[in-house]
Amino acid sequence: MNKSKFLVYSSLVVFAIALGLFVYLVNASKALSYLSSDPKACINCHVMNPQYATWQHSSHAERASCVECHLPTGNMVQKYISKARDGWNHSVAFTLGTYDHSMKISEDGARRVQENCISCHASLSSTLLENADRNHQFNDPKGASERLCWECHKSVPHGKVRSLTATPDNLGVREVK
């Protein structure tokens, strides 16, 4: 076999192996699931089981998915930029073992969730607007003295996450259809 044919065949073999590894990693990591809005993508990592289980048993389970609360709404570009940035940060943290096992929301994540709480509840509930008090000033961009919704509404939607971390199988979260 001459040298040029050997290089072509060798290159094809290396490319095929690299492609096979790439396909395997995409499949093993369930990478395509992260492009969806399916809340089950959030439990690809066992660390999120308590958050998924508490959301699943909350009033929000029938009305809002994880991405509707945790990612920007309205602008698809911003949504996927945030999703990619968060995914990259999570991947690096889990790969290097530098993540906080108690899973605390980031400052940017808290801002997005707060904006989505206000957006969803301000548009859905005229009662809250009519009876607005100092804690529910939805029309004020700073809100009620910059309080976060979950400071008062502690059980929405994740409830007592810490108590679920010790629950065997986290309420059967893996069997959810």
UniProtKB/Swiss-Prot annotation:
Binds 4 heme groups per subunit. The N-terminus is blocked. Substrate binds at residues 79, 86. Subunit of the nitrite reductase complex that mediates electron transfer from quinol to the catalytic subunit. Residues 27-177 are periplasmic. SUPFAM superfamilies: Multiheme cytochromes. GO terms for biological process: anaerobic respiration; denitrification pathway; electron transport chain. Belongs to the NapC/NirT/NrfH family. It is found in: Cell inner membrane. Heme 2 binds at residues 66, 69-70, 158. InterPro entries: Cytochrome_c-type_ET, Multihaem_cyt_sf, NapC/NirT/NrfH, NapC/NirT_cyt_c_N, NapC/NirT_cytc_sf, NrfH. Residues 1-5 are cytoplasmic. Heme 4 binds at residues 149, 152-153. Its main location: membrane. One of its GO terms (molecular function) is heme binding. It comes from Wolinella succinogenes (strain ATCC 29543 / DSM 1740 / CCUG 13145 / JCM 31913 / LMG 7466 / NCTC 11488 / FDC 602W) (Vibrio succinogenes). This is Cytochrome c-type protein NrfH. Heme 1 binds at residues 42, 45, 48, 86. One of its GO terms (cellular component) is plasma membrane. Heme 3 binds at residues 117, 120-121. Heterodimer with NrfA. Keywords: Cell inner membrane, Cell membrane, Electron transport, Heme, Iron, Membrane, Metal-binding, Transmembrane, Transmembrane helix, Transport. The chain crosses the membrane at residues 6-26. The gene is nrfH. It is a single-pass membrane protein.
